[in-house]
Amino acid sequence: MEITALTALELGKKIKAGEVTVEEAVKAQLEKIKERDSVYNCYVTVMEEEALKRAAEVQKQIDAGELKDSPLAGVPVAIKDNICTKGVLTTCSSKILNNFKPPYDATVIEKLEAAGAVIIGKVNMDEFAMGSTTETSYFGPTKNPWNTERVPGGSSGGAAAAVAAEEAWYALGSDTGGSIRQPSSFCGVTGLKPTYGSVSRYGLIAYASSLDQIGPIARNVSDCAAVFETIAGYDAKDSTSVKMEDYHFTEALVNDVKGLRIGIPKGYLGEGLDPEVKEAVLAAAKTLEEKGAIVEMFDMDMVDYAIPAYYVIASAEASSNLSRFDGVKYGYRTPDFEDLQDVYKKTRDEGFGMEVKRRMMIGAFVLSSGYYDAYYIKALQVKALIKKGFDDAFAKYDIILGPTAPTTALKMGENLSDPLKMYLGDIYTVSVNLAGLPGISLPCGIDSSGLPIGVQMIGQAFSEKTLIRAAYSLEQTRSYERPACVKGEN
């Protein structure tokens, strides 16, 4: 087995034991990217020179015994291209930021580097994280390693596809309405969306500030737990950051769900859910029940209102957040203009893609006088009711289980002409962001087309340890499946 097929923690152990050097790991990863990325288009920027230089630095630290407590020391990582990396292109996969190099690192980058991580590159995404397919990227779509005619999901599609294609051992993504969990489901990998406030957003280029959250995508639950343990923590630079009592998430990697109360909302299994996805999710629930969990179906209020509330709130915040991109201080500027107003108008028209413009227009509309109360305030009220619905459910259950997405990976181009269909694909994930809760997606089966199916587990705020334990226990009942194209090459 090639080292690129190892999990991040397995590679970390080999590096610590001196069986693999950091330079060898980096070179092996770069080789895989060169071999495969012309097909999958996972990367926007590959940091070959920087990664090799960093590998030598980290190797010295490991040899000096400085990184003993870091299980991921020396392991290369891919970073979603909306997370700031000092002096390295950070584009949000948009023309308007196609030349932007931040003057600072995001807090999560500082935390990873302090733990001995080596950043190998920046991965593709839907433009400004707006999309569910990674087809809205200015740098072209990313393809799903399981089937190149299918999308990898989004908006962290480059991150999930890179992990599945073994072009990255693990990656950092961001999740505003499902952008870590849905691509993880489509690409057959594991993705954790942490509780809002548990991971600093400082240096994450904002889409919807009250919903955005950075989290890990990896090949298994253990890797996700180790990465989350590394990046979580209070940060004074993020006003929504929260101090947690316990950051030892890898302690929860225990194969035991006895007595765990798991609820499945009936509304999650209704109309629009692919029968094969439903079967796989119910089989996962049955497995947990056989291992000692108590599994019940229940009614949960407000599920049907999550999509409209989410798109009103997220679009409103996006229209405000993206007003800073105007061609004056940084990023793309139109070469042809008459005055300052013309600069603003043409730069934004030429610099933003169609989906971003659509959401900014929706946002500007719902915030305008006459519609503010009817749409935005009402959406905030629905958000509060959704949170109450979850609170009521968690009075009875430890975990809520359901599908991550209503289908497996869609065909390329299928959703671009029908935005409403794309928005409805987020039906099981957006409510988790609206309530600020943690959620994890992990593989639970393969459909008749040979595409992976993901199951989602949702926990109470700051209950990641319970989620990790349940997900890890389920994961132990099936082996990790690799895409056929990857198996064929290794």
Q: What does each model-found stretch correspond to?
A:
Residues E31, E35, V39, E110, ...:
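Structural helix-boundary/capping segments
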Residues M1-K53, E290-G292, F365, P483-N490:
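An N-terminal boundary/leader segment
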Residues L72-I214, G267, A316, G402-L420:
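Short glycine/serine-rich loop/turn segments
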Residues Q29, A51, K80, L112, ...:
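Conserved hydrophobic/aromatic pocket- or pore-lining residues that grip, position, or stack substrates
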